[in-house]
């Protein structure tokens, strides 16, 4: 398996780039190929996907995007093509926040992801993408408001983070706060 390829970008297409290293041109499927420039030396973090009939090299700008991609393809029914469409269109923090807050509607905006797939992603990955510590940058507006209210009531960040993992933020803010409190009072 290749961990990364460092070389000169020699070709850019809508689906891939070609990175030349020591006279060998590697065709690398990229979620956002136009972030690279022809003639620029770059390091592409890679994943080699092996099927019985094909070897495909996927490339990403950073480890964080690669790690999210790998988590997504571990979900039943989500292949590399669907995972690429997810990481191509948005910031990884927004995607992680949507998964952690059970925002299936947000995930359905990506090509090839319907409600059933979005719910499967949430079911398989919720709680596995962030630490137990609360990361305010990853939270949606509703979850930030609930977190602030719980903090004002004297709960620590670890307790808040654990409760927010189980709250449905598609509902009204007051109901979400009540749900978080009910979880904390168990």
From Swiss-Prot:
Matching CDD domains: UBA_RuvA_C
Region (Flexible linker): 134-137
Alphabetized Pfam families for the sequence: HHH_5, RuvA_C, RuvA_N
Location(s) in or outside the cell: Cytoplasm
GO molecular-function terms, A-Z: ATP binding; four-way junction DNA binding; four-way junction helicase activity
Gene3D superfamilies referenced in this protein's UniProt entry, alphabetically: 5' to 3' exonuclease, C-terminal subdomain, Nucleic acid-binding proteins
InterPro entries assigned to the protein according to its UniProt record, in alphabetical order: DNA_helicase_Holl-junc_RuvA_I (IPR013849), Hlx-hairpin-Hlx_DNA-bd_motif (IPR003583), NA-bd_OB-fold (IPR012340), RuvA (IPR000085), RuvA_2-like (IPR010994), RuvA_C (IPR011114), RuvA_C_sf (IPR036267)
Key words, A-Z: Cytoplasm, DNA damage, DNA recombination, DNA repair, DNA-binding
DNA repair as UniProt keyword: yes
Region of interest (Domain III), residue spans: 138-186
Region (Domain I): 1-61
GO cellular component: cytoplasm; Holliday junction helicase complex; Holliday junction resolvase complex
Coiled coil ranges: none
Family per similarity comment: Belongs to the RuvA family.
Protein name, entry field: Holliday junction branch migration complex subunit RuvA
Gene: ruvA
């Amino acid at each position: 398996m290749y961990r990364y390829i460092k070389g000169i970008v020699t070709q850019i297409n809508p689906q891939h780039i070609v990175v030349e290293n020591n006279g060998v041109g590697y065709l690398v499927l990229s979620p956002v190929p136009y972030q690279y420039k022809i003639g620029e030396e770059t390091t592409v973090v890679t994943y080699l996907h092996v099927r019985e009939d094909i070897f495909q090299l996927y490339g990403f700008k950073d480890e964080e995007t690669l790690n999210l991609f790998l988590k997504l393809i571990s979900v039943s029914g989500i292949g590399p093509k669907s995972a690429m469409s997810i990481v191509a269109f948005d910031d990884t923090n927004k995607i992680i926040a949507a998964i952690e807050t059970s925002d299936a509607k947000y995930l359905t905006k990506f090509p090839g992801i319907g409600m059933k797939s979005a719910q499967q992603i949430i079911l398989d990955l919720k709680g596995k993408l962030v630490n137990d510590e609360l990361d305010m940058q990853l939270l949606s507006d509703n979850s930030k408001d609930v977190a602030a209210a719980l903090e004002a009531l004297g709960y620590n960040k670890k307790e808040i983070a654990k409760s927010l993992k189980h709250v449905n933020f598609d509902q009204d803010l007051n109901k979400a706060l009540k749900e978080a409190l009910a979880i904390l009072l168990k």
